[in-house]
């Protein structure tokens, strides 16, 4: 102690630094760097927090970035490009973070990080109201042409005019009917979709068969023709639906001659029933190539000796589907037999029917593969098109391949929308389509794969139970519900409106059973309410459904000819129609340039569709109010709220199930407690089952990505799988992250073939010669695959336990 009263203290602090530092050793260098950064970040955050508490409020907010001013209406407008319509004052910046974002809840952001379209929509010419185009596939004037002048009998012509209300033929019918009525040469029939190709070849066949028993004026002859008189014509079609439709059209025509019989033989039906119908007798047979080949090999009562016509409808499609060998077999068996001049009853066929077998090949698109089909089936064929000028030109140049465009009265549009906005844009388009009563009665949505069709059907259908039908008055038998359409037809939700409170939803694809497919297509055709059909390319060929006014290509076709057939489901027989194509920003926008177009395809951005579709409230299932609740009444807010609703609906646990784990740590902790190898995992009853809709969404996503990679080689420059953002595309299926296993497919185990001397006893004991037994080919359960899996799982579990339970042992914290 000093004299002046002051006190001096000496502290010994040692040689260690004042600030304690932590050094990480061991493990990978990436993990050490991450741990050091995390330690440093934690210290910096604590320092900043303490500094912020000491500072005044004014000083604290001085360093913050300036916030953008919120507009009064809260409308976000378009964020990548400003819309062409509307005043500039109505265009606002992106919406500010909602309260859900501030409180830590999940919010689905759709209008951020989207790719910029290549097309400059600002420089596109303003669309002008053009005069309605003259229909290119409409019937001709009744004063100029009629069926009687084309060479058809009076009986057939009167039946078409009075019963079927067909006063005049179309252009392709005008050029085809006289050729097939008077000549016996093969025909190469080509015309655009919806132009009446089916009747163009059916009417001459019916006319000439009818001439066996009736004169031109309709008076009967002495000879009689009935179902046992012989098989005169075979019509091949690629799909069962097209066969059914051809049969429906032919049955309407044959009402003028009820003694003539037609039938179908298609896959999915009972072969026993088909053989019974053939045994009773049939004059015109409509078949798919595979089933007809089966009957030619196994059905002895099927006699093709009297066959005079072989029609190949949609010949290019049959070649694409791999029916080349079947067609060769069919043509070979028909030509191998001797052409009978008289039938079994002694009726002379020559002079009335063709003296040779006539082959007719027809389609809307004739590609190069049809040349090969023509070499198989045609001999000196006449090329018939809708206009005489085309016929003369093809006769001079010998051209075979012609690119046919869509009907002239068809309006086409292409919507450029980012992957994240595809689903909500589709809902907005359908909602605006059915906003007015009577505006559109039926719409078809084409999707690339069956799994995606199933998912979108389950997503859009109403979850409320159907109302019981009203009881019938006394004396009337109650109508029985069709069990075949219970899973394929349902009322829709999200897309209804006060004007159309009921919109029926249908689904159709090739994986459904044939009775279900037929019943669904019939229900869609006969539906009196507004209806939507979600389908694959199975419905793109030849189907003629009345009142289809809108076709949506949600997934672009795999080839341009398929696109032509898709949009040909509308604007048929001179009626108006509209086709909409969904494209992603970027390389897909160039796809428009290679599409055949009789009318210009107008590209447009998604914002106009969202503004129109989400201008009013959206009806959603499972809520008390029945409508989608949003903080702000704008189309952008409704779009994001609808996307969030879809994601929450997929993640919702099943009734009575345990809550779904949200974080990865919770999932890992649950896996540690509940999974003890493969056998224990199978027996774990506490595992939460996934929502079936979530499982369907994941499978639909995987199938969609696989289908995206199957475009034809010439078009892959526009559909580049490597440029596809999987995370954004997952949003289009209501998923928050892209599921894995896209390229895995079905896992299969291969085994070495069992040698003749091997023993296949089910015991694992050695046989007498000392060799161990080898299991049977399908004996997967007896193979010892589980030992290696359990050992690997045990080692991985121990390593993960060491990492998660004791971090010091991994990094050797000092």
Swiss-Prot record:
Broad enzyme group: hydrolase
Stretches with biased composition (Basic and acidic residues): 28-42, 69-78, 467-477
GO molecular function, one term: RNA binding
Protein EC: 3.6.4.13
Domain Helicase C-terminal span(s) in chain numbering: 422-622
Location of the Helicase ATP-binding domain: 178-384
Disulfide links within the chain: none
Keyword Ribosomal protein in annotation: no
Pfam families linked to this entry: CTE_SPB4, DEAD, Helicase_C
Binding-site residues for ATP, renumbered to this chain: 191-198
Keywords carried by this UniProt record: ATP-binding, Helicase, Hydrolase, Nucleotide-binding, Nucleus, Ribosome biogenesis, RNA-binding, rRNA processing
Compositionally biased tracts (Acidic residues): 779-790
Localization: Nucleus, Nucleolus
Reactions that this protein is recorded to catalyse: ATP + H2O = ADP + phosphate + H(+)
InterPro entries the UniProt entry points to: DEAD/DEAH_box_helicase_dom, Helicase_ATP-bd, Helicase_C-like, P-loop_NTPase, SPB4-like_CTE
Motif (Q motif): 145-174
GO-annotated cellular components: nucleolus; nucleus
Disordered: annotated span: 26-102, 464-483, 662-695, 741-795
A GO BP annotation: endonucleolytic cleavage in ITS1 upstream of 5.8S rRNA from tricistronic rRNA transcript (SSU-rRNA, 5.8S rRNA, LSU-rRNA)
Motif DEAD box positions after renumbering to this chain: 313-316
Superkingdom per UniProt: Eukaryota
Free-text note regarding domains: The Q motif is unique to and characteristic of the DEAD box family of RNA helicases and controls ATP binding and hydrolysis.
Additional observations: Present with 1460 molecules/cell in log phase SD medium.
Similarity comment: Belongs to the DEAD box helicase family. DDX31/DBP7 subfamily.
Function as written in the Swiss-Prot or TrEMBL entry: ATP-binding RNA helicase involved in the biogenesis of 60S ribosomal subunits and is required for the normal formation of 25S and 5.8S rRNAs.
Protein name: ATP-dependent RNA helicase dbp-7
Organismal lineage: Eukaryota, Fungi, Dikarya, Ascomycota, Pezizomycotina
Gene label: dbp-7
